[in-house]
Amino acid sequence: CALLDHTVVALISGGGMAVVTSQVLDVLTPNARRGNLHVMPTSGSRYYRWDGTQWALVYAHDLSEATVAAVSESLERHARELGLWEQQVWGPRIENRGSQITFSALGQFAPVSAKQAWDSDNTKKQALVEAVKADLPHMRARAGGYTSVDVSECGIDKAYAVRKLTQTLGIRADEMVFVGDRMTPTGNDYPAVEAGAIGVRVENPQDTVQLLDALLARFDTPAR
């Protein structure tokens, strides 16, 4: 909330709008400057702005039913073949987020500790990414969170979101700072850097909090 008092913020998440709403939007204070927040869930393939009363949809690139079925089938088949179809899960393994299909090996609601331990070197996720890409070369598959793989249309990713923001805000991409934990070339945050944004890599939520605290301290320090 405090950051919105000082600057424009874009929330570009691999999660769907329901997750973004429950984890972020629903906990904003009544006086938060929502007009300074650009909400871009499912890796930027959807875009919402506050219209004074609610979060209004600006655009959505939803997948066709045939594409959803093909992606879901490929994810499940290869996850089983690779031994990634875990028996203990917390929530659905495969989610249709409208404009993106996400595979979560332990389920969307798995404990963070379990997620962090599942694929610490990213080899499991990357193996699934490569298998799905071989099936569906016209789609983009990338490692998402600790246990997830995101599949969307080629060209509709966080780079697309950055380009949309440059148009909306009238600024250059290199005037944006993009903070993310998947900044390797195979990660779903990397396209934002490819689009020209300044990338800042964090490892976990605690890193992000420390970064925000330091940034807010700079805003609150009087100019000399």
Region roles according to the model:
Residues 1-90:
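Active-site phosphate-binding/coordination module
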Residues 152-154, 158-224:
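Mg2+-dependent phosphoryl-transfer enzymes with acidic/Ser/Thr/Gly-rich catalytic loops
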Residues 13, 39, 103, 162, ...:
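Terminal peptide-recognition signature
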Residues 17-18, 46, 108-110, 147-148, ...:
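Short, solvent-exposed loop/turn segments at secondary-structure junctions
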Residues 20-22, 51, 113, 188-189, ...:
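Short glycine-/acidic-enriched loop or helix-start segments at secondary-structure transitions
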Residues 81-82, 86-177:
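Conserved acidic, metal-coordinating active-site core of Asp-based
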